[in-house]
Curated annotation (Swiss-Prot):
It holds the Pfam family GlutR_dimer. The active site is at C56. This is Glutamyl-tRNA reductase. Its EC number is 1.2.1.70. Homodimer. Disulfide bonds: none annotated. The gene is hemA.
Length: 432
């Protein structure tokens, strides 16, 4: 079985492409079914295992399959599923086989591949991806083991290194950018659109600045109100956004919508109503919540998740010692996992050996029963049974020895000596 990871991330593709390749949560299970259908007709042991990880910064397909053409098939499937021309997608896609796939999974879960070095959110996202794949019935022995090892490695890295210390989060970066536009965030009205984990983090950082007003707009009114109350703010219906957008100086949006919820026309009207006072907007969603054309307006300062990444990277350089320590841990764990994977590769051989040996045993036992039934001497029958089993079980190894030549024969003799502990060493044999 071969492990393979296919994906794009913030290192290889801009947000404009990442949002087109993203999988909304409700689409992941159906997508896994369509991916497995690519391999329809394969016998059950060869059917692929698969899991999809889709976040703001990456979309990745983890799979385990015996299909030699899996790499090309997976890339073609991703291209077809999202209706993106293959020649447009391919330059941004990475395909990582075997140990590279294992190393990548370990690095991602440990926060080493994140835009925010050492961030913990990705670990929860990966666990959710595994849970979804499990519910979809697309996990098996290999990916289950990979992800269990992945979570253990992430725990070890975070527990024994300072990889997450003093990190500049996306939320903190948003506040820093806002302070470049508005000298005092405390004098501004702030609107958060959405009520998920990222918005909660942003609200925490902005609330610490003591803004003039903090408002949360969310599709689920109850959840929005609960978040607003936590930070001493208030909630408003998302449907009121077009009519009230002009009231806010800072707007931070991160929803799970598959289409933009803030269009160019609505922002143009808001700017006009504000008499061209600036609006600072942060779009942390992938796919984006705010139409990119909004960024061209004169009095609007629009930043995406990629723009915030530049600020985040400034804080990453100071933790290179922790990175080196984490990479060393990961490399050791990759080797351990590959040893397990190599050991798994001989399981079918061992199973076949047991099946063959058991078939021989059954045949000889049946023959012995017939001999006893016709009145043959029991001692003679037992002797014949043992002789027949011995001859048939060593027939394969002795035939291989007789066919081998030169160095191959010497290696095979040493190998057989390991099987049969009391065999003489090859150097002690006078006649080969």
């Amino acid at each position: 079985m071969q492990l393979l990871t296919i994906g794009i991330n913030h290192h290889t593709a801009p947000v404009a492409l990442r949002e087109r390749v993203a999988f909304p949560l409700e689409q992941i299970k159906p997508a896994l079914s369509t991916f497995k259908s690519v391999f329809l007709g394969h016998p059950a042991p060869n059917a692929p295992e698969a899991a999809i990880l889709s976040t703001c910064n990456r979309t990745e397909l983890y799979c385990a399959t015996n299909d030699r053409a899996a790499r090309d098939a997976a890339i073609r499937w991703m291209s077809d599923y999202h209706r993106i021309p293959a020649d447009e997608l391919a330059p941004h896609v990475y395909a990582l086989p075997q140990s590279e796939a294992v190393r990548h999974a370990f690095r991602v879960a440990s926060g080493l591949d994140s835009m925010v070095l050492g961030e913990t959110q990705i670990l929860g996202q990966m666990k959710n991806a595994v849970r979804t794949a499990s519910e979809a019935g697309s996990l098996g022995t290999y990916l289950n083991q990979l992800f269990q090892r992945t979570f253990a490695v992430a725990k070890e890295v975070r527990g024994t290194t300072e990889i997450g210390a003093q990190s500049v989060s996306m939320a903190a970066a948003a506040v820093r950018l806002a302070q470049r536009i508005f000298e005092q965030v405390a004098q501004q009205r702030v609107l958060f659109i959405g009520a998920g984990e990222m918005i909660e983090l942003c609200a925490t950082h902005f609330a610490a600045q003591g803004p003039r007003e903090l408002v949360v707009a969310n599709r689920t009114a109850e959840r929005g109100a609960k978040l607003a109350e936590r930070f001493g703010g208030r909630a408003m219906p998302l449907a009121d956004l077009p009519a009230r957008m002009h009231e806010f100086d800072i707007i931070v949006s991160c929803t799970a919508s598959t289409l933009p919820i803030i269009g160019l026309g609505a922002v143009e009207r808001a700017v006009k109503a504000r008499r061209h006072r600036p609006i600072f907007m942060v779009d942390l969603a992938v796919p984006r919540d705010i139409e990119p054309e909004v960024g061209k307006l004169k009095d609007v300062f629009l930043y995406t998740v990629d723009d915030l990444g530049a600020i985040v990277r400034e804080g990453n350089a100071s933790r290179q010692a922790a990175v080196a320590q984490a990479e060393a841990i990961i490399e050791t764990r990759v080797q351990n996992f590959m040893q397990w994977l190599d050991a798994r590769s001989i399981v079918p051989v061992i199973r076949h050996m047991h099946t063959q040996a058991d078939a021989l045993r059954r045949a000889e036992v049946e023959r012995a029963r017939k001999m006893l039934a016709r009145g043959d001497d029991p001692d003679a029958v037992l002797d014949a049974l043992s002789q027949a089993l011995t001859n048939k079980l060593i027939h394969g190894p002795t035939s291989a020895l007789n066919r081998a030549n030169g160095a191959d024969r010497d290696s095979l003799i040493d190998l057989m000596r390991g099987f049969y502990q009391h065999a003489p060493r090859s150097s002690d044999t006078s006649d080969r």
